[in-house]
Amino acid sequence: MGFLNIALYFSIYSFLGWICEVFYCSVPVKKFINRGFLKGPVCPVYGFGALFVLYIMNWSNVNSAILIFILGGVIASIIEFIADILLEYVFHTRLWNYSNRKFNIKGRVCLFNSTLFATLSVMLIKLIHPIVKNIINRLNMITIVIIAILCIVILLMDIIISVKGIINLNNILRNMNIFKDIKKEFKLNKQRRFIEAFPQLEHKKYMAELKRFKELLKDLRQKNKHE
Protein backbone atom coordinates (compact mmCIF):
# COMPACT_ATOMS: atom_id res chain seq x y z
CA MET A 1 0.00 0.00 0.00
CA GLY A 2 1.57 3.26 -1.13
CA PHE A 3 1.00 6.59 0.60
CA LEU A 4 -1.53 7.78 -2.00
CA ASN A 5 -3.55 4.58 -1.69
CA ILE A 6 -3.47 4.88 2.09
CA ALA A 7 -4.74 8.47 1.82
CA LEU A 8 -7.61 7.34 -0.41
CA TYR A 9 -8.51 4.39 1.82
CA PHE A 10 -8.42 6.63 4.87
CA SER A 11 -10.68 9.22 3.23
CA ILE A 12 -13.14 6.65 1.91
CA TYR A 13 -13.48 4.76 5.19
CA SER A 14 -13.67 8.00 7.19
CA PHE A 15 -16.59 9.00 4.95
CA LEU A 16 -18.29 5.60 5.24
CA GLY A 17 -17.80 5.77 9.01
CA TRP A 18 -19.46 9.18 9.03
CA ILE A 19 -22.44 7.68 7.18
CA CYS A 20 -22.68 4.93 9.81
CA GLU A 21 -22.53 7.48 12.65
CA VAL A 22 -25.13 9.76 11.06
CA PHE A 23 -27.49 6.83 10.45
CA TYR A 24 -26.93 5.46 13.97
CA CYS A 25 -27.63 8.83 15.63
CA SER A 26 -30.24 10.30 13.27
CA VAL A 27 -32.70 7.41 13.00
CA PRO A 28 -33.65 7.25 16.72
CA VAL A 29 -34.40 11.00 16.90
CA LYS A 30 -35.86 11.14 13.38
CA LYS A 31 -33.76 14.11 12.27
CA PHE A 32 -30.42 14.62 10.57
CA ILE A 33 -27.47 14.93 12.94
CA ASN A 34 -24.05 15.72 11.51
CA ARG A 35 -22.21 13.38 13.83
CA GLY A 36 -18.48 13.82 14.02
CA PHE A 37 -15.67 15.82 15.56
CA LEU A 38 -14.99 17.47 12.21
CA LYS A 39 -17.47 19.67 10.34
CA GLY A 40 -17.15 17.75 7.07
CA PRO A 41 -18.63 14.31 6.26
CA VAL A 42 -15.77 12.33 7.76
CA CYS A 43 -15.04 10.47 11.00
CA PRO A 44 -11.24 9.99 11.07
CA VAL A 45 -11.42 7.44 13.89
CA TYR A 46 -13.13 5.09 11.42
CA GLY A 47 -10.43 5.77 8.84
CA PHE A 48 -7.69 4.93 11.33
CA GLY A 49 -9.62 1.91 12.55
CA ALA A 50 -10.10 0.56 9.04
CA LEU A 51 -6.42 1.02 8.15
CA PHE A 52 -5.25 -0.72 11.33
CA VAL A 53 -7.68 -3.60 10.81
CA LEU A 54 -6.56 -3.99 7.19
CA TYR A 55 -2.88 -3.89 8.17
CA ILE A 56 -3.21 -6.36 11.06
CA MET A 57 -5.32 -8.80 9.05
CA ASN A 58 -2.93 -8.63 6.11
CA TRP A 59 0.15 -8.94 8.33
CA SER A 60 -1.26 -11.89 10.29
CA ASN A 61 -2.85 -13.43 7.18
CA VAL A 62 -6.16 -13.88 8.99
CA ASN A 63 -9.08 -14.96 6.80
CA SER A 64 -11.44 -16.52 9.32
CA ALA A 65 -14.56 -14.39 9.83
CA ILE A 66 -14.57 -15.33 13.53
CA LEU A 67 -10.97 -14.18 14.05
CA ILE A 68 -11.62 -11.01 12.05
CA PHE A 69 -14.66 -10.36 14.25
CA ILE A 70 -12.65 -10.77 17.45
CA LEU A 71 -9.49 -8.94 16.37
CA GLY A 72 -11.45 -6.20 14.60
CA GLY A 73 -13.52 -5.53 17.70
CA VAL A 74 -10.42 -5.39 19.90
CA ILE A 75 -8.49 -3.10 17.52
CA ALA A 76 -11.41 -0.70 17.05
CA SER A 77 -12.06 -0.57 20.79
CA ILE A 78 -8.42 0.22 21.53
CA ILE A 79 -8.50 3.06 19.00
CA GLU A 80 -11.76 4.42 20.46
CA PHE A 81 -10.31 4.21 23.98
CA ILE A 82 -7.13 6.06 22.97
CA ALA A 83 -9.11 8.68 21.01
CA ASP A 84 -11.25 9.44 24.06
CA ILE A 85 -8.15 9.80 26.26
CA LEU A 86 -6.46 12.13 23.76
CA LEU A 87 -9.55 14.35 23.44
CA GLU A 88 -9.81 14.57 27.20
CA TYR A 89 -6.10 15.31 27.65
CA VAL A 90 -5.74 17.83 24.81
CA PHE A 91 -9.13 19.60 24.84
CA HIS A 92 -10.42 18.64 28.32
CA THR A 93 -13.56 17.24 26.70
CA ARG A 94 -15.20 13.84 26.39
CA LEU A 95 -17.43 13.43 23.35
CA TRP A 96 -19.01 10.17 24.47
CA ASN A 97 -19.62 8.35 27.73
CA TYR A 98 -20.83 4.76 27.90
CA SER A 99 -21.02 4.63 31.71
CA ASN A 100 -24.76 3.87 31.54
CA ARG A 101 -24.17 0.83 29.32
CA LYS A 102 -23.31 -2.66 30.50
CA PHE A 103 -19.77 -4.00 30.22
CA ASN A 104 -18.07 -0.65 29.71
CA ILE A 105 -14.49 0.33 30.56
CA LYS A 106 -14.42 3.72 32.30
CA GLY A 107 -17.21 4.84 29.99
CA ARG A 108 -14.76 5.04 27.09
CA VAL A 109 -15.69 1.78 25.36
CA CYS A 110 -18.52 -0.70 25.81
CA LEU A 111 -19.38 -4.20 24.65
CA PHE A 112 -22.29 -3.08 22.46
CA ASN A 113 -20.21 -0.65 20.40
CA SER A 114 -17.28 -3.06 20.27
CA THR A 115 -19.63 -5.67 18.83
CA LEU A 116 -20.78 -3.20 16.18
CA PHE A 117 -17.16 -2.39 15.30
CA ALA A 118 -16.36 -6.10 15.14
CA THR A 119 -19.24 -6.65 12.70
CA LEU A 120 -18.07 -3.71 10.58
CA SER A 121 -14.57 -5.21 10.54
CA VAL A 122 -15.88 -8.43 9.02
CA MET A 123 -17.87 -6.46 6.44
CA LEU A 124 -14.76 -4.39 5.68
CA ILE A 125 -12.48 -7.35 5.04
CA LYS A 126 -14.94 -9.67 3.34
CA LEU A 127 -17.07 -7.24 1.32
CA ILE A 128 -16.21 -3.54 1.29
CA HIS A 129 -12.43 -3.40 0.90
CA PRO A 130 -12.22 -5.80 -2.08
CA ILE A 131 -14.68 -3.56 -3.95
CA VAL A 132 -12.91 -0.32 -2.96
CA LYS A 133 -9.50 -1.78 -3.80
CA ASN A 134 -10.72 -2.92 -7.21
CA ILE A 135 -12.12 0.55 -8.01
CA ILE A 136 -8.91 2.33 -6.97
CA ASN A 137 -6.75 -0.12 -8.93
CA ARG A 138 -8.65 0.85 -12.07
CA LEU A 139 -7.77 4.53 -11.68
CA ASN A 140 -4.75 5.95 -13.46
CA MET A 141 -1.94 7.50 -11.41
CA ILE A 142 -2.81 11.11 -12.26
CA THR A 143 -6.39 10.64 -11.06
CA ILE A 144 -5.18 8.98 -7.86
CA VAL A 145 -2.72 11.81 -7.18
CA ILE A 146 -5.35 14.53 -7.75
CA ILE A 147 -8.00 12.84 -5.61
CA ALA A 148 -5.53 12.02 -2.83
CA ILE A 149 -4.17 15.58 -2.69
CA LEU A 150 -7.69 17.04 -2.65
CA CYS A 151 -8.72 14.70 0.16
CA ILE A 152 -5.62 15.54 2.21
CA VAL A 153 -5.99 19.31 1.74
CA ILE A 154 -9.72 19.30 2.55
CA LEU A 155 -9.15 17.09 5.59
CA LEU A 156 -6.36 19.31 6.93
CA MET A 157 -8.49 22.43 6.47
CA ASP A 158 -11.39 20.74 8.25
CA ILE A 159 -9.13 19.70 11.13
CA ILE A 160 -7.82 23.26 11.54
CA ILE A 161 -11.34 24.74 11.48
CA SER A 162 -12.73 22.10 13.87
CA VAL A 163 -9.85 22.42 16.35
CA LYS A 164 -10.31 26.18 16.28
CA GLY A 165 -13.99 25.59 17.05
CA ILE A 166 -13.12 23.49 20.10
CA ILE A 167 -10.68 26.14 21.30
CA ASN A 168 -13.40 28.78 20.84
CA LEU A 169 -15.82 26.63 22.82
CA ASN A 170 -13.29 26.42 25.65
CA ASN A 171 -12.90 30.20 25.55
CA ILE A 172 -16.67 30.68 25.65
CA LEU A 173 -17.01 28.37 28.65
CA ARG A 174 -14.10 30.08 30.40
CA ASN A 175 -15.80 33.47 29.98
CA MET A 176 -19.42 32.43 30.57
CA ASN A 177 -19.78 34.90 33.44
CA ILE A 178 -19.00 37.83 31.12
CA PHE A 179 -20.90 36.44 28.15
CA LYS A 180 -22.19 39.51 26.30
CA ASP A 181 -25.85 39.32 25.23
CA ILE A 182 -25.05 41.05 21.95
CA LYS A 183 -22.81 38.15 20.93
CA LYS A 184 -24.66 35.33 22.67
CA GLU A 185 -26.88 34.09 19.85
CA PHE A 186 -24.03 34.27 17.33
CA LYS A 187 -21.66 32.25 19.49
CA LEU A 188 -24.34 29.75 20.45
CA ASN A 189 -25.23 29.09 16.83
CA LYS A 190 -21.57 28.62 15.89
CA GLN A 191 -21.25 25.80 18.47
CA ARG A 192 -24.76 24.39 18.01
CA ARG A 193 -23.80 21.66 15.52
CA PHE A 194 -21.08 20.32 17.79
CA ILE A 195 -23.23 20.30 20.93
CA GLU A 196 -26.13 18.57 19.16
CA ALA A 197 -23.80 16.00 17.59
CA PHE A 198 -22.51 14.99 21.02
CA PRO A 199 -25.33 15.30 23.59
CA GLN A 200 -23.17 13.47 26.16
CA LEU A 201 -20.35 16.00 25.78
CA GLU A 202 -18.48 16.54 29.04
CA HIS A 203 -15.88 19.13 29.96
CA LYS A 204 -13.38 18.33 32.70
CA LYS A 205 -12.63 21.96 33.58
CA TYR A 206 -15.91 23.77 32.89
CA MET A 207 -18.70 21.27 33.57
CA ALA A 208 -21.02 23.82 35.22
CA GLU A 209 -20.39 26.32 32.45
CA LEU A 210 -21.08 23.67 29.81
CA LYS A 211 -24.38 22.84 31.50
CA ARG A 212 -25.36 26.51 31.39
CA PHE A 213 -24.23 26.72 27.78
CA LYS A 214 -26.49 23.78 26.86
CA GLU A 215 -29.40 25.47 28.66
CA LEU A 216 -28.83 28.67 26.69
CA LEU A 217 -28.73 26.64 23.49
CA LYS A 218 -32.00 24.93 24.43
CA ASP A 219 -33.63 28.31 25.12
CA LEU A 220 -32.38 29.63 21.78
CA ARG A 221 -33.77 26.56 20.00
CA GLN A 222 -37.19 27.09 21.61
CA LYS A 223 -37.07 30.77 20.70
CA ASN A 224 -36.34 29.97 17.06
CA LYS A 225 -39.27 27.53 16.93
CA HIS A 226 -41.72 30.23 17.98
CA GLU A 227 -40.42 32.83 15.54
Pin down the residues of each PLM region:
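Aromatic-rich, lipid-facing transmembrane alpha helices and their immediate juxtamembrane interface loops
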Residues: 1-227
